[in-house]
């Protein structure tokens, strides 16, 4: 099994939004910001290949279809994910599975592409099954007031219309050694892939734990729709990660891609930085 991280680009998010009730005097010691309180966030994708009959992509960034509507976020260094895959010897048509942790624009925007001449929107990965949780899909179609601006129907409609959408209701095995587990809090039923290799499990933590600075369970983003649930789900993830020595992959951390975590008394902390 080959695991490769692809950074699809970066954007700015307000530090107060990212760290919620945590005061800047505390969070600024863990994560830098600019003069307007903007924190640079990555949009991280994970490519899993050399799996029998599978080429798996986890999340795919914001794409380019909605950059004008999202100009507030000041995107920069965006890459064409299809070109990045070609550099790794994989054409988009070879991707068999696209796992979407959730359907906020910064995680699924490259799921579809737009023909600028005809206006047609079509799946970026024409032969792939797109994995989404059922509750997340329902929330995407009928969003709550706090999430509606994070969803764009153009990112997913062509996938559903083309019969490429696979909805899951419970923890599911995608294939041997890759499990898809469901976590609530940030948004309904976020998918978190657990990738088991000999001697090591990698956890694509999504927005359950988006940054190494967010490892402390109380450090909950204001973007989390259900903060008490977020706390409980973070503890659930962290207890196992600390006990089993799992590697967390942080989808938004521009400075730390992966690390293990440790539990010291009743506190969780980032432990060893890991390179993939």
Language model regions located:
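Metallo-beta-lactamase
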Residues: 64, 76-90, 94-106, 124-182, 232-245, ...
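Active-site metal-binding loops of divalent metal-dependent hydrolases
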Residues: 8-10, 60-63, 103, 135-136, ...
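Residue-level marker for buried hydrophobic side chains located in beta-strands
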Residues: 56-58, 99, 130, 202-204, ...
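Short, basic/aromatic-enriched C-terminal tail that caps enzymatic domains
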Residues: 258-276
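Metal-dependent catalytic neighborhoods of phosphoester/phosphodiester hydrolases
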Residues: 71-74, 108-119, 259-262
């Amino acid at each position: 099994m080959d695991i490769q991280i692809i950074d699809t680009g970066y954007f700015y998010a307000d530090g107060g939004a990212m760290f919620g009730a945590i005061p800047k005097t505390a969070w600024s010691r863990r994560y830098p910001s600019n003069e307007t309180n903007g924190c640079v966030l990555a949009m991280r994708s994970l490519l899993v290949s050399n799996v029998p009959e599978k080429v798996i992509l986890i999340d795919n960034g914001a794409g380019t279809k909605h950059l004008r509507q999202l100009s507030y976020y000041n995107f920069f260094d965006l890459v064409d994910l299809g070109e990045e895959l070609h550099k790794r010897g994989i054409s988009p048509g070879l991707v068999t599975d696209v796992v979407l942790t959730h359907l906020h624009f910064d995680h699924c925007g490259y799921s579809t592409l737009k023909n600028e001449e005809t206006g047609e929107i079509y799946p970026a990965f024409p032969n792939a099954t797109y994995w989404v949780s059922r509750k997340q899909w329902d929330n995407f179609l009928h969003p709550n007031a706090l999430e509606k601006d994070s969803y764009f129907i153009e990112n997913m409609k062509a996938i559903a219309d083309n019969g490429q959408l696979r909805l899951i209701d419970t923890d599911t095995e995608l294939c041997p050694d890759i499990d898809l587990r469901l976590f609530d809090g940030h948004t309904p039923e976020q998918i978190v892939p657990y990738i088991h290799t000999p001697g090591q499990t990698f956890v694509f933590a999504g927005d359950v734990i988006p940054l190494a600075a967010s490892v402390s369970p109380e450090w909950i983003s204001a973007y989390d729709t259900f903060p008490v649930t977020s706390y409980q789900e973070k503890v659930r993830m962290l207890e196992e990660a600390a006990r089993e020595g799992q590697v967390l992959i942080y989808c938004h951390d521009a400075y730390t891609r992966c690390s293990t975590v440790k539990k010291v008394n009743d506190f969780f902390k980032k432990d060893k930085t890991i390179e993939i």
